[in-house]
Amino acid sequence: MLRFFLRYTYKPARILASRLPDLRNDLQKSNLYISAEGIIFRSMLFMLISIPFIVVAAYFLAQAGLGIFVIALPVAVVAPLMLMLNLPKISASSRSSALENELPYVVGYITVLAGGGISPFITIKRLSKADAIFPAAAREARRILLDIEIFGMDAISALEKVTKTNPNKLFADFIGGYVAVLKTGGDALSYLESKLKDIFSYTEGKVKRGSEFIGTMAEAYIIVTVVMGISLTILWSTQNLLGGISNGGVGGTVGLGGTQTLNASLIIMFSVLFVPVISLIFIIVIGSAQTREPFSFDLPFYVFLACLPAVAVCYFVPFGLPQYTQLGIGLAIASTPAAILQWRYVKHRKSVESKLANFLRDISEVRKTGLAPEKTIEQLAGRSYGGLSEHIKRISSQLSWGTPMRTVLQNFGASVKSWLTRAMAFLLLEVVDVGGGSTKMFTDLADFTEKNAQLQVERRSMVRPYIMIPYIGAVMVVMTTAMMLYFINPPGLSEAGVPALAPGSIVEKATNILLICSFFQAWVMGFVAGKMGEESAADGFKHATFLVVICIITVYVSFYFISGIKF
């Protein structure tokens, strides 16, 4: 069947490909290894496969009395074609983003090696083997080597091709300028150093723009979740607790037999479905504006999945506590182990990264005395470098035993869980292994590390204030719920002979429903706080736990001062 379909779609695919010249350019800039005709053929195949499903969907919609939605089904027929035609652009954007995150380190790597007299070809060859540290840059280097070693292009021509086929404009401009300097015989090292400064300036501007964007997203998130949640809580409480007055009752929605019922579907759907989906969208959008490392620490997520059944146990098993309190405790129990694991990882990573620039600067200064790199590290083993000290002492011990520098630094890179530290260890290894550990190369590496450390500190300080926004929002939701319940059924009405606006049983059920939704909503908002303020959703486990605990304390403190509400 596939051959039959290919026979009748090959010519239309070729005609369509000839009328879409940008498609070939997009494919060259993407990570897709397929021709323009091939991707059009696949899109037509997916269109053909989707037609029976769309016909069945149209039949069921018509039977359900939703025939108006059948009008939109033809759009679903062409959706596979539009998706496949835009797939190269999506892939090119992903390729560009991954390379841009590594670009300062890659340019710093090329600059350091160029300062030691290493040729561009050797630099590219060594970079192509750095998958463990710079996966995106290593793929780009292998593309260049493929043109040189397989297709017989010279190094300059292969680099010129990069300027036309690479989707990242910053990297393409860097390579284009580098090629121009090599062609004219200019000072390549001076160009690399100036370009490195430009890239740091660009990255600094990107960090500032990203922080402003995160601020805008934080305001939008508060409006969508907190303001809308408070408004919905007030409307729901008014409808369900006071609605019975218009029906001759004293509150609630009058059901069969004159009984009062609560319709909680809307408020539950908002808190359990709408808020998590919106939060996930905000996390993805915020992540697109943040600098991402090639590798991440995913163990907290697996620990959280293992602890997730605790939520069901605490919620459904009666422990003599209000149901919303049991849910809050269950959510806190589920996220606490992951929060502790992530906290320990972040603490260790920061303790190592904070002293890395000082260590490399001390190496460059001691190296000026003429000591060998191995002896230089041994001399620095007695100094205090925070969390980095234990690793330096281990490196010094291994070097004193005669272990080769390459093996020692590779073991060091494997023992730390910080990608930044691994990248710097890789650069240090290249300085010693390729450049012989010259004083200038150590100085260049130290300068680069200090600039990068300053940029990291500035980036964290600019986004950290946004952590408090979800905290304020979660407390507002809980406080609004408590005050709403107080105003609906204030104390002292019975003593004054005034009937209560809503029966105690209805108020108790409404309290349970509203606080269950508020606790879950606050817990979800903690992950957004982690992504906004610490650039990692895994840090959200800590904030989610804190928010649930704060909400529980807020509820009990509020109910202590607001009499007349059962909890």
Pin down the residues of each PLM region.
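Helix-boundary and N-terminal cytosolic regulatory elements
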Residues: 13-64, 536
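Cytoplasmic membrane-interface regions of multi-pass membrane proteins
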Residues: 23, 27-31, 204, 208, ...
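Hydrophobic alpha-helical segments characteristic of transmembrane helices
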Residues: 1-31, 107-127, 151-208, 221-246, ...
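Membrane-helix interface and helix-disruption motif detector
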Residues: 61-67, 256-265, 293-295, 316-325
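Bilayer-spanning, highly hydrophobic alpha-helical transmembrane segments
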Residues: 41-60, 72-82, 205-285, 305-307, ...
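Membrane-cytosol interface segments
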Residues: 1-34, 255-260, 265-269, 281, ...
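Juxtamembrane/interface alpha-helical elements of multi-pass membrane proteins
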Residues: 69-163, 173, 309-413, 423-430, ...
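Transmembrane helix-loop junctions at the membrane interface of multipass transporters and ion channels
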Residues: 237-245, 288-291, 310-325, 529-531, ...
